[in-house]
């Protein structure tokens, strides 16, 4: 007996897909299988749990049972999928198997932990489950080391600092947010973090961690050591591709899909943080929302390609929030930066003076939507 559409995963991508399918078809069988509890929570909230004093259970918005009842679903929480038999169209776990007509991989991405001695002492905050496992340690920690100065690392550094903790942030790059924007643009946030008391160790490398009687000793390059109570890895995400690889699907950085979210197997699709769409991995909310809308149509028999417009990325650093869009990481752009007390507007233009990217901060963020309209598609 077929289970209709089977979705592996229960995060934001999977839930958006379910909601979009049910808007168009109330009865088609939908089965979700996931290794977690399947309770709903807002993942971006993890960047602010410490300053807001939230426990892991406080993040739950809807239980798995409520979700199943609302959308007429068959749910299998706490279930590890071990294999996909693509030829037979069967998903397998240790104790069960499910026949499918169409299969969607929404397996997400896992936090990358740098391969240094003592890496097992590093914590990650990529899910409610991960936060639940370490919330007591993080709440009690006075000294926190954050490894990675990208989007999540910068958000966490500000949040822990706002909670009154002594925060050190270490990154190989010469500036924070180095993979997103040039240093002349990120310097405003970098200065604000320093003003707040975050100790920035840039152009620096973590070489190892060791448990001590009074905490964790972090060994850095140039014969430096610091002692902290907790170490958080914020060094990026890696799409979960192991299951897709075992199924014989085409893999690059993520599970490769085309504009229809279809993998190299015509009956298997991928969505969200695990997917690589025409060569791009886009682990942000808006592209996932748009992808879920298109995939729902395609699973129900339409043939709709995904067309992604220029989209905003929000950096949730409350003391100095940023919005950015476009090709902010391009090396050949000229940046025109207008800085005022109430905020910044940075425009990245090409050789033809065409706007290709922008970053806005604080009160100037209201200008983002006007700038967004002028970016090329």
Curated annotation (Swiss-Prot):
Pathway: Nitrogen metabolism; nitric oxide reduction
GO cellular component, one term: cytoplasm
Keywords, ordered alphabetically: Cytoplasm, FAD, Flavoprotein, NAD, Oxidoreductase
EC number of the protein: 1.18.1.-
Cofactor or coenzyme needed: FAD
Catalytically driven reaction(s): 2 reduced [nitric oxide reductase rubredoxin domain] + NAD(+) + H(+) = 2 oxidized [nitric oxide reductase rubredoxin domain] + NADH
Inducing stimuli: Submicromolar concentrations of NO induce anaerobic expression. Repressed by oxygen in the presence of NO.
Superkingdom of the source species: Bacteria
Subcellular location per the Swiss-Prot or TrEMBL entry: Cytoplasm
BP GO annotations: cellular response to nitric oxide; nitric oxide catabolic process
GO MF entry, a single one: rubredoxin-NAD+ reductase activity
Main location: cytoplasm
Sections of the chain in a coiled coil: none
Pfam families, A to Z: Pyr_redox_2, Rbx_binding
PANTHER family attached to this UniProt entry: NITRITE REDUCTASE [NAD(P)H], PYRIDINE NUCLEOTIDE-DISULFIDE OXIDOREDUCTASE DOMAIN-CONTAINING
Stated family: Belongs to the FAD-dependent oxidoreductase family.
Function: One of at least two accessory proteins for anaerobic nitric oxide (NO) reductase. Reduces the rubredoxin moiety of NO reductase.
Name this protein carries in UniProt: Nitric oxide reductase FlRd-NAD(+) reductase
Chain's gene name: norW
């Amino acid at each position: 007996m077929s289970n209709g559409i089977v979705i592996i995963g229960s995060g934001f991508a999977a839930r958006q897909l379910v909601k979009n399918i049910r808007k168009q078809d109330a009865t088609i069988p939908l089965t979700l299988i996931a290794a977690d509890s399947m309770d709903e929570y807002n993942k971006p909230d993890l960047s602010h749990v410490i300053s807001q004093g939230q426990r892991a259970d406080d993040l739950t918005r809807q239980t798995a049972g409520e979700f199943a009842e609302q959308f007429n679903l068959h749910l299998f929480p706490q279930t590890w999928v071990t294999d996909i038999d693509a030829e037979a169209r069967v998903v397998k776990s240790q104790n069960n198997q499910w026949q499918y007509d169409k299969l969607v991989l929404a397996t997400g991405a896992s936090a990358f932990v740098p391969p240094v001695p003592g890496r097992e002492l590093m914590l990650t905050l990529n899910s409610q489950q991960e936060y639940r496992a370490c919330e007591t340690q993080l709440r009690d920690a006075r000294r926190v080391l954050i490894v990675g100065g990208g989007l999540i690392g910068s958000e966490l550094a500000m949040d822990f600092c706002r909670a009154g903790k002594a925060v050190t942030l270490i990154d190989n790059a010469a500036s924070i947010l180095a993979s997103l924007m040039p240093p002349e643009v990120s310097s405003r946030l970098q200065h604000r973090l320093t003003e707040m008391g975050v100790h920035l160790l840039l152009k620096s490398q973590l070489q190892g961690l060791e448990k001590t009687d009074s905490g964790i000793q972090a060994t850095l390059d140039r014969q430096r050591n610091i002692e902290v109570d907790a170490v958080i890895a914020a060094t990026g995400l890696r799409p979960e591709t192991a299951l897709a690889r075992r199924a014989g699907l085409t893999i690059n950085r993520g599970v490769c899909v085309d504009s229809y979210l279809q993998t190299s197997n015509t009956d298997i699709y991928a969505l969200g943080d695990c997917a690589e769409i025409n060569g791009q991995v886009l682990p942000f909310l808006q592209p996932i929302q748009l992808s879920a809308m298109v995939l729902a149509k395609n699973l129900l028999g339409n043939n709709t390609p995904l067309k992604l417009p220029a989209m905003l990325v929000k950096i949730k650093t409350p003391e100095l929030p940023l919005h950015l869009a476009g090709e902010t990481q391009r090396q050949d752009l000229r940046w025109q930066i207008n800085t005022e007390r109430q905020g910044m507007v940075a425009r990245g233009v090409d050789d033809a003076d065409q706007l290709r990217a922008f970053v806005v901060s604080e009160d100037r963020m209201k200008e983002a939507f006007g700038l967004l309209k002028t970016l090329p598609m």
